[in-house]
Amino acid sequence: MRAPEFWSRRSPLACGLAPLGVAYGLGARLRQGLARPHRVTAPVICIGNLTVGGAGKTPTALAVATMLRGLGHRPHFLTRGYGGRLAGPVRVDPAVHTAADVGDEPLLLAAEAPCWVARDRPAGAEAAVADGADVVVMDDGLQNTRLAKDLCLAVVDAEAGFGNGFVLPAGPLREFVADGLERVQAVVAVGGDGACLQHLAVLLKLLRRIFHRGNPVKAVADRFLELQIEQVDRRLDLADGLRETGCHGGAEKILPPLFLLFCRLLAGGHVLHPDAVQ
């Protein structure tokens, strides 16, 4: 589905729909506040975004799983299986299942690591752990309230950003930006070439403005904005010194080398993380 043009600008139509977006956003905030998520024994890494549509989540999830395997772990993917008829939990078998069964992206994920399709995310995560997963990588699901996450990465299109800044149906956002980013430990800005750096600078300024003092994402935005824009790209790509993020469920044993490799190897992406700058 093609996104409406008014999602990219604050047109009269978008402004007219804005009250509905506020109601939608408040509903999303209430759901998160009332959530009592289920925790599995393996760490859960969620690759999500704040807007509808693709923003590089699946390639990012693939990169994370590839690096986890390189570190000797047994990652399994977990996804809802949009576009497929199977509710799951079911382990995707590319030799048996089709896109009509599980959707397109699970077939792509299953070529790299075991992939589970489950509309019931806790049940899918439990199935993955029972099948030998020592870490679960969720492709999408940042707004899902039923499964506890140990690490959340928000993938943002560095050029499109958050569109007109309105929540559905007035804009592309699934929830208020500040609400979503308060639950993440890193922002992955996926962009093309150097032309996206100005958009990245705008994103950093937005992050700095919406977060309270002491928030880790605000801290890194503050630090990066002290650099010249030409330096930002180089500094993010060469970010070393990444430390554990204080996650639960044993994730702290996985995440430091994961983030180090993530910064070095994720092609075309810029990782904004508070430990990236000493």
Predicted regions and their residues:
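Intrinsically disordered, low-complexity segments enriched in glycine and mixed charged residues
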Residues: C196-Q278
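A broad detector of short, well-ordered amphipathic alpha-helices
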Residues: G21, P59, A63, A123-E126
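Phosphate/Mg2+-binding loops and adjacent switch elements
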Residues: G81-G83, A87-G194
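Walker A (P-loop) phosphate-binding motif
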Residues: Q32-H97
